[in-house]
Amino acid sequence: MHYGLVLFTSDRGITPAAAARLAESHGFRTFYVPEHTHIPVKRQAAHPTTGDASLPDDRYMRTLDPWVSLGAASAVTSRIRLATAVALPVEHDPITLAKSIATLDHLSHGRVSVGVGFGWNTDELVDHGVPPGRRRTMLREYLEAMRALWTQEEACYDGEFVKFGPSWAWPKPVQPHIPVLVGAAGTEKNFKWIARSADGWITTPRDVDIDEPVKLLQDIWAAAGRDGLPQIVALDVKPVPDKLARWAELGVTEVLFGMPDRSADDAAAYVERLAAKLACCV
C-alpha cells in the first residue's frame, strides 16, 4: 500500500511545483490536485459536506487549472506520479483534453493518473452545457473517446455527446493505459459504473467506514469480468497504524492525505511530520 498527497491548489500558499517536489522528496507515491473551472455565485447544488449551497471555504473559487499545475510539477520531479482528485472532463472539449493529458504523460515519462468525478456542482456543469441528468453518460463517452485518441493510430468515436471521424493524434501517452479512477460515494450504482468504465475508486470525505464498500466494489468488479482487483485510493486525515494495516489487507492500494495550502515552510513542516508518522506504521 502506498501513500499520496493532495493539494487543494489556489492562488496563494505553496505552489504545485514546490508541493510535488516536497512530496517526492519524502517518499510519497502520488501528487494530486483538484479541479473547478469556476463557481457560480447563485447556485442550487448542495456541497457534499455542507449539505447546502454554502462552501466549506473559498478555495473552490480560487482553484488553479489542474493540467497546468501538474505540468509545472512534472518539470521539477522525476518519480512521483501526477494525478487529479478529481478532474471534471465533461467541462472541456474531449479532443483537446485528450491532447493535454497525453502531452503531460509524454513529458513526464509516463507518470499520469486521471481521477475524475461526475460533478457535484451541477450549476458549474450547466455553464459548460452539460445536462446534469446525463453527466454520467457524457463522462463515459469522454473517457472512451479519449482512450481511442490515446491508443489508436486512426481514432474515431460516434456517441451521443462526442463524435469525430478518423483522426491522427500524437503524442500517444507513454503508458499503454492511463489509469482512470472515479471519486464518488461508495454505492452499488457508482461501483457498477466504475467496473464498466474505470480502473478504480477514490473515496470521498463521507466514506469513513470503507470495509463493506471495498468488498462490494471487489465483488462487482469480479462479476463484471474484470481482471485483478480495482485500484482503491482512500482519503485519510490522521495515520493510525491499526487502521492502515486493515486497509492494506482489504485491498486499498493508496492512502491519500491532504496537504495544507499554506506557506512553503508550513507545508514542509506538515509533510515532514506526516512522513515520520507513516514511517512508524511500516
UniProtKB/Swiss-Prot annotation:
Pfam families: Bac_luciferase. It comes from the Bacteria. Disulfide bonds: none annotated. One of its GO terms (molecular function) is oxidoreductase activity, acting on paired donors, with incorporation or reduction of molecular oxygen. To M.tuberculosis Rv2161c and Rv3079c. This is Uncharacterized protein Mb0978c.
